[in-house]
Amino acid sequence: MASRRRARQRALQILFIWDARKQPVEDAINAYYDTLYSDEKPERDPFVIDLVRGTVEHLAEVDDRITRHAEHWRMERMPAVDRNILRLAVYEMTRGGTPAPVTIDEALELARKFSNEESVQFVNGVLDAVRREMPEPNAPPARLNS
């Protein structure tokens, strides 16, 4: 099985295909694996598939969180790679069970690899703002006043 970092790269590439082609997520997953592996058909990494499907399934919530913290940027005006790095990271941070610092670090690595230094700073700022609005992992549950 691929490392988690490689899995996130693959998930990003699939999300990029999905976003660019405006096609069903399963078609994007198939297109990625069929294009990347034309002669052999490796076992699909469940972590990759879960990240992609989860991001798309919760897209409205994910995009809303990004939009609230991406000052002066509309989703459709962001570079596609940055938009999908943010989507992947916000999903993983809020629903995927990965600690926020790990998710942010991994997203910054993706931005360094697939985008530019300005994007690294932008991604860091947005994800840090999303992290700050999340409840602390070990915080006691909020009490309801009766």
From Swiss-Prot:
<keyword id="KW-0889">Transcription antitermination</keyword>
<dbReference type="Pfam" id="PF01029">
    <property type="entry name" value="NusB"/>
</dbReference>
<comment type="function">
    <text>Involved in transcription antitermination. Required for transcription of ribosomal RNA (rRNA) genes. Binds specifically to the boxA antiterminator sequence of the ribosomal RNA (rrn) operons.</text>
</comment>
<keyword id="KW-0804">Transcription</keyword>
<comment type="similarity">
    <text>Belongs to the NusB family.</text>
</comment>
<keyword id="KW-0805">Transcription regulation</keyword>
<protein>
    <recommendedName>
        <fullName>Transcription antitermination protein NusB</fullName>
    </recommendedName>
</protein>
<dbReference type="GO" id="GO:0031564">
    <property type="term" value="P:transcription antitermination"/>
</dbReference>
<dbReference type="InterPro" id="IPR011605">
    <property type="entry name" value="NusB_fam"/>
</dbReference>
<dbReference type="GO" id="GO:0003723">
    <property type="term" value="F:RNA binding"/>
</dbReference>
<dbReference type="GO" id="GO:0006353">
    <property type="term" value="P:DNA-templated transcription termination"/>
</dbReference>
<dbReference type="InterPro" id="IPR006027">
    <property type="entry name" value="NusB_RsmB_TIM44"/>
</dbReference>
<dbReference type="GO" id="GO:0005829">
    <property type="term" value="C:cytosol"/>
</dbReference>
<dbReference type="InterPro" id="IPR035926">
    <property type="entry name" value="NusB-like_sf"/>
</dbReference>
<keyword id="KW-0694">RNA-binding</keyword>
